[in-house]
Amino acid sequence: MVYKSSKETQERKDLKKKRIIDTAFKVFSLKGYHGTTVKDVVVAADISVGTFYFYFKNKEDLFETLYDEGSVEFYNALCHSLVNINNEIDLGFSKAIAFFLSTIELNRPLAKIMFIDAVGLNPNFERKRAEVTQRYTNYTAGYFEQMKKSGKASIPDIKICSLAFIGTLYNVIMDWLQDTSPHGLTDCAYTLTVYNLQALKIDYKDSQVKEGINQILHKI
């Protein structure tokens, strides 16, 4: 019975911590990191200040938890998007880019926290951001290596080409997050796909590129 009670207590703690994190996500999304205070989160989550500090050391600790969870979510999206990139490469490339962009588009508040609010906060966050980029690049490099070996693409340097590919995604996402026009991020999927295919000298059919994008967007 002691074990059961301990387990139930831990589950309640985990649920409360998750509720604080979920609430903080909404507050950070509305006010940004610098505009949010611990009091804002406490009031929104309907908890005491003591409860907040039981789970988190300070606002930065809470934000770091959000950042880490967001990093995992977007990394998993990238991994999922690249799974079939080498199958019918023009179709696969377009599906990969469309899927990743659609994931970001559907999670714009989280993306804003990840790509904008976390920039330049402190050396620790800059290190985390660099590690995230490195994970993205390393994972992409595995698929680019397959492309190079199969002769499907012109890849003189796998690391540099992987960095460049991730860079095109990152810069388009950053522009979209700061853009006030109503266009969706997935509107960029076609141009971004064609640009990368041409940069890697990959033969493609325009119809295949459009078909791949449509297949992904129609599933959303």
Could you tell me what each predicted segment is?
Residues F56, I116-L121:
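Short helix-capping/turn signature of helix-turn-helix
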Residues V72-C79, P123-K149, K159-L163, N171, ...:
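Amphipathic alpha-helical packing segments from all-alpha helical-bundle domains
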Residues R19, V27-D61, T65:
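Helix-turn-helix
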